[in-house]
Amino acid sequence: MMFKRNFGKAFIMYSICTLMLFFTSSKDLAWAASTANSPEQTTDEEDTVQAADVLLIYGSNPTEQELQSIEVIVKTITYLQRSIVFLPASQSIDILDNYENIICYNISSDQNELMKSLAMVEKNILFFGGNAVSDYIKDKTYDIEVTYADEVVVSLAYNFTELRSFSNINRLKNTSFLKGEFNYQSGIIEYENNTAALYSAFDNFWYTPVIDLTDEIMSASFAQEAAIWLWPYNGMPHSYSQYIVLNEVYPFYPPESLMEIVDFCINNRLSFIISVMPVYENGDYPAMKRFCEVLRYAQANGGAIILHAPNAVAEQDNTELLWDYLTYATEAYTNFGVYPLALQVPENYLFDETGREVLQRYTTVFCDRNYANSKFNINDKFNTIYKDGHLLIAPDYTIGQEQNVQMETISTAAYISVSQDIEAIKDDIIAVTQVNVVHKSLWDINHRVYAENLYFYSRNGELYFNDKKVSLAYTPFTYEKYEYDSGVFKWIAKDLSSLNKQLAFIVVISSIIFTLFIFAGRYRNRKRFLLPRQKGNKDGVD
């Protein structure tokens, strides 16, 4: 009886404890859930997305061409050393206060709430086309006339400098043209016997009717206008460095020709860069040594060397493999006293996770245009490469067949092909230098390069290899007889050499024997067919 009573008490106590534990756990779980859903609590990823210099708002369901234009905007802002968040209009209304600079790309008229919210915030706003701009102008009560065009053929013209102006024909759809008193205007659009500015600004409101930034003039002009738009002070923004790059120079390039080009740059007091192709094997061959001797001469006379990314493995997703290739290539040059200060890569490295990991070993990165294989993803929402702190050098902008555009508002590289004759290369160099911009030396900037078992950096024009200062003075190489190690072919060659000696001995002996046989045969034939003469008989007949 006592046992049953004690058991009953114990069971009741156990049940009470279990219920208390359940309610406590439920409260903890509810608190955790409410904390996770609280707007005051955000993840690191959300914080990263919201912290940026520029917010780009785009319309719903962008077309392929619109995605390419958005990519141009993101790349341009990135080259200007700014961070950018890109979101659809539906995700942007509640976060407008977090950004000082806002780009509205092709926003349609059904975004009334967004336009009202934009009109209420005093931000630096740039519109690319879209008929929602009329709602924004109305909400701001600007004295600006808006003319809507469903589809129209226009002539675009833009002056990059007083001496560099370009024009072309374009077709615009679903856009608006503005007329009014503006604080700033640049470029000209001619349409249906009317004219408008390509870019117009009134206070903090900027507008362009063109949304196709794949157009050569638009992509180049935006690089200049974006720098002005982001500049918070009066006047023009500060100048960026411009570079001349002899592009994709292979070790088998004739050293005499390369020396002539280098001397041409030196004699004309030009700052220049040589982009060398990677070498993975046979880096000790005399041809490589002669190539590096010319590079050292260029390096000692103000030229800089950069390494071109491996073409053969550019699409690999294996970071370790790419690092290995780059280490082999770097060592092939540093072994001869040549120090590539930067890496040259396709632009798709900027938007690819593996590419960004590879670039972490370089502070300075030169970019190539790569339209065919874009890695840009609209769902990334942020230019992640910005966080890595690289100095990114954009490729120069090409308009038409041969017209390159360099401007001081963005740092660009003019790539000159060396796969043409010497005089054509010199003409290209002269054409680039005639642009009204200053081309600077890569040695004016500090760089850092890491590899598997080495690193080097430049500081104030001096170079340090594994923390030891290195002399960049040019001294000619001495050349010795080189034994080419060809692996299996080497012992085959030795075997053939030995066999050749044996064959030569056999041929000599055979020739001697053959000669003896000839003499013996002639002697026997003479005895057999030619009769000896008899004495006293002149005719040799009895």
How should these model regions be labeled?
Residues 526-542:
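Cytoplasmic C-terminal tails of single-pass
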Residues 145-146, 282-286, 295-297, 304, ...:
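Active-site-adjacent pocket scaffolds in enzyme catalytic domains
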Residues 52-59, 126-139, 268-362, 372-377:
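Metal-dependent polysaccharide deacetylase catalytic core of the NodB/CE4 family, i.e.
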Residues 218-219, 227-297, 301:
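Active-site beta->alpha N-cap acidic-glycine motif
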Residues 233-238, 263-269, 273-282, 364-377, ...:
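C-terminal domain-boundary segment and adjacent tail
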Residues 233-234, 241-255, 349, 389-448:
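Catalytic grooves of carbohydrate-active enzymes
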Residues 52-53, 98-99, 124, 143-151, ...:
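A glycine-centered loop/beta-turn motif at secondary-structure junctions
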Residues 108-167:
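A glycine-rich, often tryptophan-bearing local segment used as a flexible ligand/cofactor-contacting loop or short
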